[in-house]
Amino acid sequence: RLRSIGVSERVTASKLLWMHPRQMEKGSVSIGFVAEAMACIRLRGLDPEGVLRQAGIAPDLLNAPHARVSSRQFGVLWHAIAQAIDDEFFGMDRHPMKVGSFTLLCHAVIQSDTLERALLRALRFLRLVLDELSGELVCEGEVAHIVLHDRRMDTDRPQALSAQPRRAFAHGTFMVILHGLACWLVGLRIPVMGASFCDDAPPYADEWR
């Protein structure tokens, strides 16, 4: 029976601290994460204001570094972006996580008799869906470690894959998907005991603590 989760990272270029519930302003998300999520919209030349307004987020907030949005607004934004680009992973992997993938992931794990088996199935599923990011589950008693692997940083990969550094937001999104899924399965907020990453902290690092 797993009671907590630790996070570590291998073969990557970013350092990330996992999101913890904030003592202040619970249920809110930094505008920095909104800007990160919107990067795929800008890169594709789509209408950012239209996507933001679907989530009830004023476009001017992107120019206010201390602004925050509600967790619900960020969830609606995630859905709107996924619908706009047909990718539930914000276009951050070479292979898109097409709309409907997360629903199928939930169906794939819902009948698991233990959380450990559910996480193993989830990691196998994500390995099939994504090309560059994958995870490994290491259990030590009641503590589970999720080890993140990023193929973009492998030395034997084509140079084109490593030409652009991986955004820490990609690593965080991968872990948030897994952690949110695990909490949903057991109906509890599973505590994150710690995180270890191999490079400097990204912008808005305090927001992940």
Predicted regions mapped to residue ranges:
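Alpha-helical bundle regulatory/interaction domains
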Residues: L115-R209
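N-terminal low-complexity or simple alpha-helical regulatory segments
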Residues: R3, V7-R151, P203-Y204
